[in-house]
Amino acid sequence: MPELPEVETIACGLRPALSGRRIVGVTVHNPGTLEGPLCTPAAFTEAVQGQRIADVGRRGKLLLVAFASLPPVGHAGQPRPEGLSSSTVRDFLVTHGFHAAGCATSVHACAPLLADGQQTRGRLAGHGDGMDGTSRTGSTLPGTGGTENSDAVAVADDDTVLGLAFHLKMTGRLFIHPPATPAGIHTRVVFDLEGGTRLFFDDARKFGYVRCITRRSLALWPFWRDLGPEPLETEARGFAARLARRRGRIKALLLDQKVVAGVGNIYADESLFRAGIRPDTQAHTLTPERLFALHGHLQDVLRESIAECGSSIRDYRDAHGDAGAFQNSFRVYGRGGQPCRHCGTTLATAQVAGRTTVFCPQCQR
C-alpha cells in the first residue's frame, strides 16, 4: 500500500498537470470505486463535472484534489479570481485540513492544521488530543463529540463541494494521460480535463476508492476526523507523549492511523531499525529519550524516501508511471533471513499487528 512518501510523490507529480484545470467530463467504469454520500455515478458526476482544480495535496495516505469552488479564505467579500494565486490556494487548503503537496525538500514545512482554519502549533484537525499530549478545548468539527458553535453548525449544513479524496489502498494508481488515451482494463474512473488531458484512477484489485467531499461530509467522515497527526509536522516531545501514554506494541501504534497518519509497514520497520527498537516492544516501556530518537529517525526515513520518489515494491508508480528508488536503501524491510547490513546478524521475521515484520535481534532491543 502506498504510504506517506508515495502519496506525497504522486501529489507532487499531479500538481502541475491538474492545478487550474477544469474537469469537463467524468466517466465511472466501476461504481464500486465511489464512496461517500455522492457515491452513485450520476451524483458523483454532477458534483465533479465543471469544477476547477485549485491544488493537489495529501493528508496521511489520502491524496486530495481541492476544487476552487469557494471564495478565498481570509479575504471576505473578495471574489476568487480565475487565476488562482498560491496564497489563496494555501488558505483554502489550510482551512479544510488539506496538506498542499510540496517538493522533496519542503514537504515537512507545512504547518499543523485545524479544520476551522486556525493554525495552532502542536495540534491537529478534528482530533481529540493535541500533538503536545494535552487535550484540545473549544470548538471541534461536528460529530467529534466536542463543543459545537455557530461555525460548526454552519459546516454541518454546508454541501459546498470541496474536492476529491483518493485512497489508493493496495493497487490504486493515478496517471496523467494525453488526449484520447483509451481506458485500460483496470481503469475505474476517468476525469477529462480542459485541453484534453485525462486523469485515470486505475485499481487492479478494486480496494481503492475516490470520495467527493463537501464541507458537511468531510466534517462527518470518521476516517478523516480520526486521523492522527502528520509525522513530519510533530515535535519530538509531542510524538513521545502521544506514544508513551498508550499500551501496545510500538510498531502496532506506528501503523495505527489514529495515532500517526501516513506510516505503514515499510517506514515503521525502517525507522524502528534505525532507532534500535524491537518492533514488539511495549510503547509505554520506552524512555522519552528512545521515543525522541524514534521520532527523528522516522522523519529522516520519510524525507529520504520522498527525495527518492518513494518505494516501488510491486505496484507503486508515480503519476507519470515511473518507479521510486528508496527500496534500494532498505535496511530491514523485505530482507528477512538476510544478514543485517550493520552487524551481520541474520534478520528475524515476526508478525506484529498482522503484518510481516523484519528486525535485527542484535541491533534492536
UniProtKB/Swiss-Prot annotation:
GO molecular function, one term: zinc ion binding
This protein's record includes keyword DNA damage: yes
Record's keyword terms, sorted: DNA damage, DNA repair, DNA-binding, Glycosidase, Hydrolase, Lyase, Metal-binding, Multifunctional enzyme, Zinc, Zinc-finger
Highest rank taxon of the organism: Bacteria
Keyword Ribosomal protein among record annotations: no
GO annotation terms (biological process): base-excision repair
UniProt-listed PROSITE patterns: FPG_CAT, ZF_FPG_1, ZF_FPG_2
Stored InterPro entries: DNA_glyclase/AP_lyase_DNA-bd, DNA_glyclase_Znf_dom_DNA_BS, Formamido-pyr_DNA_Glyclase, FPG_cat, MutM-like_N-ter, Ribosomal_uS13-like_H2TH, Znf_DNA_glyclase/AP_lyase, Znf_FPG/IleRS
EC number: 3.2.2.23, 4.2.99.18
SUPFAM superfamilies: Glucocorticoid receptor-like (DNA-binding domain) (SSF57716), N-terminal domain of MutM-like DNA repair proteins (SSF81624), S13-like H2TH domain (SSF46946)
The protein's required cofactors: Zn(2+)
Positions annotated as active site in the UniProt record: P2 (schiff-base intermediate with dna), E3 (proton donor), K61 (proton donor), R355 (proton donor)
Residues where DNA binds: H186, R205, R246
Catalytic function, reaction form: Hydrolysis of DNA containing ring-opened 7-methylguanine residues, releasing 2,6-diamino-4-hydroxy-5-(N-methyl)formamidopyrimidine; 2'-deoxyribonucleotide-(2'-deoxyribose 5'-phosphate)-2'-deoxyribonucleotide-DNA = a 3'-end 2'-deoxyribonucleotide-(2,3-dehydro-2,3-deoxyribose 5'-phosphate)-DNA + a 5'-end 5'-phospho-2'-deoxyribonucleoside-DNA + H(+)
Cofactor note as given: Binds 1 zinc ion per subunit.
Zinc finger (FPG-type): 331-365
Residue ranges with Polar residues bias: 134-150
Sequence segments annotated as region (Disordered): 121-150
Pfam families found in the cross-reference section: Fapy_DNA_glyco, H2TH, zf-FPG_IleRS
Biological function: Involved in base excision repair of DNA damaged by oxidation or by mutagenic agents. Acts as a DNA glycosylase that recognizes and removes damaged bases. Has a preference for oxidized purines, such as 7,8-dihydro-8-oxoguanine (8-oxoG). Has AP (apurinic/apyrimidinic) lyase activity and introduces nicks in the DNA strand. Cleaves the DNA backbone by beta-delta elimination to generate a single-strand break at the site of the removed base with both 3'- and 5'-phosphates.
Cross-referenced NCBIfam families: fpg (TIGR00577), PRK01103.1 (NF002211)
Subunit structure: Monomer.
Family listed: Belongs to the FPG family.
Protein name as annotated: Formamidopyrimidine-DNA glycosylase
